[in-house]
């Protein structure tokens, strides 16, 4: 039996949407062809990601894929973090390593200081007691978010250089997320926050 679904008009109230008859196993064509329409003016958002000592190539590839999907400006790969070309990265990046600009930096501290001089807010994603809840955080764009080693996190020396620490709220008992999963949560929240600023600026014109 076919199901009828109507694409949301939340962000484009003037659009004319035709209901699409779908089988339960079919994908919604709207998501493929029109979902990016409200974001056409954004292109890349002023968000970059710094990975320091992320040991899993699969995690690195997943970061590339999330950065591509959310429209991030760049990935900075530091320490032992793997870098393209590598089959392990490609397996989860699915080609995103070719679409997202990236740089390798042996000295993350020097990179952080340079980005701060350029006006970036540097935010460490960590579980420190002084960290701000991700959903309460009011970032100052452009922003560079830092993620560290899957077990050890970010080194204290790097945490001390950051302008702010941000934590993802954890309601379960494990109090942890895979680092690449955490990356997806953070960059999409930054996309949401930046789009709100973009929409407000557009309305004010």
List each model region and its residues.
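Post-transcriptional modification and biogenesis factors for structured RNAs
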Residues: 1-205
């Amino acid at each position: 039996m076919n199901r009828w679904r109507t694409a949301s008009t939340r962000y484009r109230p003037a659009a004319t949407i035709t209901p699409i008859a779908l089988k339960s196993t079919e994908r919604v064509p709207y998501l493929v062809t029109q979902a990016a329409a409200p974001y056409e003016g954004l292109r890349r958002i002023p968000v970059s990601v710094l990975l320091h000592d992320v040991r899993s190539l699969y995690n690195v590839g997943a970061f590339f894929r999330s950065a591509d999907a959310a429209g991030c400006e760049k990935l900075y790969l530091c320490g032992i973090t793997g870098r393209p070309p590598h089959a392990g990265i490609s397996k989860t990046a699915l080609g995103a390593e070719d679409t997202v600009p990236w740089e390798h930096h042996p000295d993350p501290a020097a990179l952080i200081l340079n980005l701060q001089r350029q006006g970036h807010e540097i935010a460490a994603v960590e579980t420190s007691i002084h960290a701000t809840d991700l959903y309460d955080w009011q970032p100052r764009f452009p922003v560079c978010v830092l993620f560290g080693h899957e077990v050890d996190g970010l080194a204290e020396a790097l945490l001390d250089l950051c302008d702010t620490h941000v934590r993802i709220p954890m309601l379960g008992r494990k109090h942890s997320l895979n680092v690449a999963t955490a990356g997806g949560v953070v960059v999409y929240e930054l996309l949401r926050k930046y789009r709100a600023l973009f929409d407000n600026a557009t309305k004010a014109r």
